[in-house]
């Protein structure tokens, strides 16, 4: 299957939002997250959130097979060295086929090409499968924190060039 990763244009944001919602819905289901107990979870973000992030300069990328988008991620610059990876999402029916790794490798190359040397990410700490996947792809666990307003623990990982 031929794939390409391209920078997202504003008119493609609704398609990206569908990928994000469908992808993160599996996480919400697994951890019992709802709009009531976790209204800011990625599975519930509105289109206006993506539009605002784009306006603020967040780099957004879509993974396409033929003409169909099956993956999404974005990067924001924290400082001269570090970028944060946001919302890496692959549609459930395309998981476990190497597409997540393809996007992650693209993020690493993008950060290096921009002069960065570190990628940070926040995840649900209790998602051991996801945490182990990032560690297998070169990330190190740097800590965790429990916030009163979240029904899970936030976990933090980073990758260095």
Across the structure, where does each feature detected by a protein language model lie?
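A short helix-loop-beta-strand connector motif used in the catalytic cores of GNAT acetyltransferases and
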Residues: 45-61
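C-terminal "cap" of GNAT-fold acetyltransferases
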Residues: 117-131, 135-137, 144-161
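Conserved N-terminal entry element of GNAT/NAT acetyltransferase domains
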Residues: 1-14
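A conserved beta-turn-beta hairpin within the catalytic core of GNAT-like acetyltransferases
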Residues: 77-86, 95, 116-117, 149-153
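Conserved beta-strand in the GNAT
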Residues: 62, 68-76, 84, 89
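A short, internal acetyl-CoA/4′-phosphopantetheine-binding micro-motif in the GNAT/acyltransferase core
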Residues: 88-95, 123-124
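Conserved acetyl-CoA pyrophosphate-binding loop and the N-cap/start of the following alpha-helix
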Residues: 94, 98-106
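Conserved GNAT-fold acetyl-CoA-binding loop/helix
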Residues: 21-49
């Amino acid at each position: 299957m031929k794939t390409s990763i391209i920078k997202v244009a504003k008119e493609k944001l609704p398609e990206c939002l569908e990928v994000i919602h469908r992808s993160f819905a599996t996480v919400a289901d697994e951890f019992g997250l709802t709009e009531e107990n976790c209204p800011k979870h990625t599975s519930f973000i509105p289109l206006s959130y993506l539009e605002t992030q784009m306006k603020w300069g967040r780099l957004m990328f879509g993974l396409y097979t033929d003409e169909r988008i099956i993956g999404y991620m974005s990067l924001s610059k924290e400082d001269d060295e570090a970028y944060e990876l946001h919302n890496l999402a692959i549609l459930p029916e395309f998981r476990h086929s190497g597409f997540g790794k393809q996007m992650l490798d693209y993020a690493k190359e993008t950060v290096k090409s921009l002069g960065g040397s570190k990628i940070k990410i926040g995840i649900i700490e209790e998602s051991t499968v996801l945490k182990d996947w990032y560690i297998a792809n070169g990330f190190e666990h740097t800590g965790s924190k429990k916030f009163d307003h979240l029904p899970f623990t936030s976990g933090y990982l980073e990758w260095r060039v």
